[in-house]
Amino acid sequence: MNFVLFGATKGMGRALARLLAERGERLFLVEHCIDELEASARDLETRGAQLPVRTAHCDLLAPATFAPALEQAERELGQIDAVIVTAGLFATQDKLESDPELTARILTADFTNTVLFCEEARKRLLARGGGTLCVFSSVAGDRGRKPVILYGAAKAGLSRYLEGLDHKFRRQGLKTICVKPGFVKTGMTAGLKPPPFAGTAE
């Protein structure tokens, strides 16, 4: 299968990309840091991904990069079978409460721009007759929690959007999967006290 992965250079995205590489899948990576993209591509090639693993610049904070990145993926892969989105930002509630600019950045990245990227992916998958859109949200959006009020609000909106997308387009061949991990020990959560049930990216 042909996979486009947004956010595969670190954390859960990297762990998932490595699993797909070990299965011998064909991968196309999109991310904002070119150096990390190229390093990840070479890593995945050594793990069994179909050669070559191509990449394209795509910045979650720059929606104008979404369509060109997916267009390049279509050209390189021939067709896209699945799009996986693990990209996102995080900040603690205390930091967000004291920094309106950071709050706007988190809400924009984790809700508005993630939805805009998914809309670009949705249109392309439906145009080819369907496919899979898998997006990582969070259990932080399931109910209001004091430590993650603002981050959780963004993830709540994202989860509802993905749920509606699946209801509307499943019969047209588009399968939308909303993954909601709990606390996972990654670079994003570094410095936070993990609960007893915390998992790892792997």
Model-predicted segments: where are they?
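SDR active-site lid
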Residues: 166-202
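Active-site loop immediately N-terminal to the catalytic Tyr-X3-Lys motif
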Residues: 96, 145-149, 192
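Residue(s) in the substrate-gating loop at a strand-loop-helix junction
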Residues: 138
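Conserved glycine-rich Rossmann-like NAD(P)H-binding loop of the short-chain dehydrogenase/reductase
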Residues: 23-40
